[in-house]
Amino acid sequence: MTPHHESAGSAGSPDSADSPGQVVVRLDRVSKEYGDTLALDALSLEIRRGEAVAVMGPSGCGKSTLLNMVAGLDRPSAGTIDVHGQDLGGLTETGLALYRRRDVGMIFQFFNLIDDLPALDNVALAAQLTGTSARQARRRALELLDELGVADRRNNYPATLSGGERQRVGVARALMNRPALLLADEPTGALDSRSGEQVMDLLIDLNQIGQTLLIVTHDPHLATRCAGRLVEMADGRIARERSLNDRALDSETPDGTASDGATPNGATPNSETLNGKPLERSA
């Protein structure tokens, strides 16, 4: 499962061979206004290749707006957003649509699966929309479902899947086009505790093989387990930013409560397997 970096086809797109630590996401003084409401206020942020960054804050702080900006679902009122060498503000609507399909993968809180399609077709459709043949798309979709431990549910419709199974299908869909950046919007918010922990393990494994992650969450446990850096927002701005890689020594979670002793970037490092299956390492 190699994170792959294809541009959306715009002129001057970067070479797909990134080096570790290269800036993948750069927001420079980004503001967003909705009428009289200022959702983002001159916010600047960088995310490097291979990082897992969690964004937290109270409702209305701007974290969902931030995610939508990076996902190409909305445009800023001011400032620039650069993702994998592309200035999103310079893309046409067609270019933005291609960017959303190829360069970023999105994991939704409530899964956003198509009810009338079985799991395999839900995943395969993501690649077919970028021009991949149905046969090739279904083959890769099956490989992903197998790696995520739900291949035996490939012919099941979403309504017959558990919440954890639906989220795994959603993760497979997000990974289908080998995105440079994986975005997660409250990925465990609709799950029970056990399923939520399994999805956290999955995010940790993906990050350990090189996948860049941006996670928006209210959950300090998710943030401290899955991220190496925490961005706390308030009133459309970054109020605090800190590394979580020393949190075993810090002993506090983002909300100031005692931590559970989680190790940096999750549990025991295992960069070669996901769900007990071998994975390709990022190039």
What spans do the regions from the language model cover?
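ABC-family P-loop ATPase nucleotide-binding domain
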Residues: 1-31, 243-260, 265, 269-283
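Short beta-strand in the C-terminal region of the ABC ATPase nucleotide-binding domain
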Residues: 234, 239-242
